[in-house]
Amino acid sequence: MVELAKNERIDYMYSDDLKIIQDKTAFSFSLDTLLLASAAKDVIHDRYKVADLCAGNCAATIYMAYFNRAKYDAIEIQDEAASQARRSVALNNMENRI
């Protein structure tokens, strides 16, 4: 079970299939995030290695990874966002790919 900080919530995307941990007081993923990730996923093949720079809470990376078997490196330098990303990846059982 993933623990949430006092100011965090779990949001869902792509129906209820994907769960993202977000800070209630910080930037949250939006339609723009999903549109960008949707366009990117269409050119990513299963054998690719993908780097997501400034990954934030990993919403775009998790969305892209849902649609293929590529390997992803999600890179984030802000401690809180990186923590949310790690826990979101675990929540979606994608630790072996992201």
Language model features with spans:
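Compositionally biased, low-hydrophobicity segments enriched in charged and small polar residues
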Residues: 1-6, 84
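SAM-dependent Rossmann-like transferase core, predominantly class I methyltransferases
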Residues: 3, 11-46, 55-67
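N-terminal start-of-chain detector that recognizes signal peptides
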Residues: 7-9, 23, 72-74
